[in-house]
Structures are given as structure tokens and as C-alpha cells.
Amino acid sequence: MAKRTKKVGIVGKYGTRYGASLRKMVKKIEISQHAKYTCSFCGKTKMKRRAVGIWHCGSCMKTVAGGAWTYNTTSAVTVKSAIKRLKEMKDQ
């Protein structure tokens, strides 16, 4: 079998349509949404995207809400770290 894509990867399905810069942006998004992420409950790399913002772990069968294209958004990480810091300050 011949190798199909060398540079374009997952966005090869769009062919020459829509322009190179738009396809590069879409490539970054599609790679992140199809990737498997580490589950925050069981620690295994089984977290997959089911729908927009819905993530499901195939190991522990937990379903959680997350980002549209990635499991954790930057704002969610910031909020979690702030909550953790406030809990530590309260305990002291």
C-alpha cells in the first residue's frame, strides 16, 4: 500500500479545499480531540471524547464534562489549582 499523507495527516480528508492555514488550525484541534487522555480518577490513559465536552474513561467507566476539544481547559486547570491552594490555606 502506498503512503497517503506525509505532511497533512488527519486533515488530508479535506484535500486542497479551505486553504492551508485553516487546515493547519483544524489539524491541531482534531489531533487533540482524537487523542486519549489520562483519567483523573483511575490514572489510566483511557479517557476518550464521546461528544462535545463529554469525556468517558473506558477503564473505570466514569463520564465527565470537560473541554470541547481537550479533556482539561486552561481555565479549568487554573480554577482547580486555586481551589486546592485555598483548601491548603484553610487547613493551616
From Swiss-Prot:
Transmembrane segments: none annotated. The keyword Nucleotide-binding does not apply. One of its GO terms (molecular function) is structural constituent of ribosome. Pfam families: Ribosomal_L37ae. GO terms for biological process: translation. Keywords: Cytoplasm, Metal-binding, Ribonucleoprotein, Ribosomal protein, Zinc, Zinc-finger. Zn(2+) binds at C39, C42, C57, C60. A zinc finger (C4-type) spans 39-60. It is found in: Cytoplasm. One of its GO terms (cellular component) is cytosolic large ribosomal subunit. Component of the large ribosomal subunit. Belongs to the eukaryotic ribosomal protein eL43 family. Component of the large ribosomal subunit. The ribosome is a large ribonucleoprotein complex responsible for the synthesis of proteins in the cell. This is Large ribosomal subunit protein eL43.
